[in-house]
Design a protein with these regions (language model features):
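Nucleotide-sugar donor-binding/catalytic module of glycosyltransferases
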Residues: 1-233, 312-315
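C-terminal subregions of glycosyltransferases and related glycan-biosynthesis enzymes
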Residues: 5, 202, 207-209, 213-319
Length: 319
């Protein structure tokens, strides 16, 4: 039962915000419209140069609390500031350009109580940039890898490392985070979600994921980092740090899974390094990268061949 105590809300919703004047209102509105009324919103502005702060302060609602970083410090540090200021029993993560279904908190807290969970998440409704609504869900897009998901399931550290659920937006039991001194690692501007979730699981957190999709995830270019190359480079640094820190003797399977995760991200980085000049029309750079990497050449030969060289000549360059 909700106590509606403003000094001890059931849920504190953490929103780091940077230059999101056109999106932040929808995020906050979706929290204030929740069927669970016992909430507060903690917005931390990360050095915005637009009207983001004005949007947040414009609510004039005691449930919406606004803090400002003196300079841009990244989403991890901003979330930590918000968590430290939060007063709720649960900490919910919401990105400033996303929003929720109105009963998301009520459903996820019921799931947490039913399973005795320390962390609960749900599927994501994927909204492409510029689209009016979702076109798919995360679990649907990855159905070949994840299989059919039609009921809640638990995620342990090994499953997190193998299947990469780091993109999910969790609710954390505040007591669990505080007792174990766990926060986001501010050294990373990408991959920090995966890193914290894995460290929580290594600290014996119980994580349950709903098969329902109640979080609208907007795929917006430039929302966190400058480019996919920069993002993936940060994720690789984060993964290297985890592999160094995790005890291979105690958690050998997890280290092996992290090494596999690192290999996949390295492949993605190679592709991203090719796609950036491809999308920018820097064709000479594309050809140079393709010549150095025959596998990449075969994947993108049709594009390069139409624009630049016959496929046969491209193949000659690498044989």
């Amino acid at each position: 039962m909700s106590n509606l105590d403003p000094m001890r809300p059931r849920v504190s919703v953490v929103i780091p915000a940077f230059n999101v004047e056109g999106y932040l209102g929808a995020a906050i509105d979706s929290v204030l419209a929740q069927t669970l009324a016992d909430v507060e919103v903690v917005v931390v502005d990360d050095g915005s140069t637009d009207a983001t702060v004005a949007v947040a302060r414009g609510y004039g609602d005691a449930r919406v609390r606004v803090f400002e970083n003196v300079r841009n410090q990244g989403p991890a540090r901003s979330r930590n500031v918000a968590i430290d200021q939060a007063r709720g029993e649960w900490i919910a993560i919401l990105d400033a350009d996303d929003w929720w279904k109105e009963d998301r908190l009520e459903r996820l807290l019921a799931l947490a109580e039913a399973h005795g969970a320390d962390i609960v998440c749900d599927d994501l409704l994927l909204v492409p940039e510029g689209a009016p609504g979702p076109e798919s869900t995360l679990f649907t897009v990855h159905a070949q890898r994840l299989g059919r998901i039609d009921k809640p399931f638990e995620v342990d550290a090994l499953k997190m490392a193998e299947d990469d659920f780091g993109i999910l937006k969790p609710l954390f039991r505040r007591e669990f985070l505080d007792e174990r001194g766990l926060r986001y690692n501010p050294a990373f501007r990408a991959g920090e979600d995966f890193e914290l979730l894995l460290r929580c699981l290594l600290a014996s957190a119980r994580m349950v994921v709903s098969h329902e999709a109640m979080y609208f995830y907007r795929a917006r270019r430039g929302s966190l980092v400058a480019s996919p190359v920069q993002c993936l480079s940060q994720i690789l640094e984060m993964t290297d740090a985890l592999i160094r820190d995790v005890d291979a003797k105690t958690h050998g399977e997890i280290v092996q899974a992290l090494e596999g995760y690192r290999r996949r991200k390295r492949d993605e980085l190679g592709d991203a390094r090719f796609r950036e000049p491809l999308h920018a029309g820097r064709w000479g750079e594309c050809v140079s990268l393709a010549v150095k990497n025959p596998a990449m050449l075969l994947r993108y030969a049709a594009v390069l061949g139409e624009r630049f060289l016959p496929l046969g000549l491209l193949l000659v360059l690498v044989t």
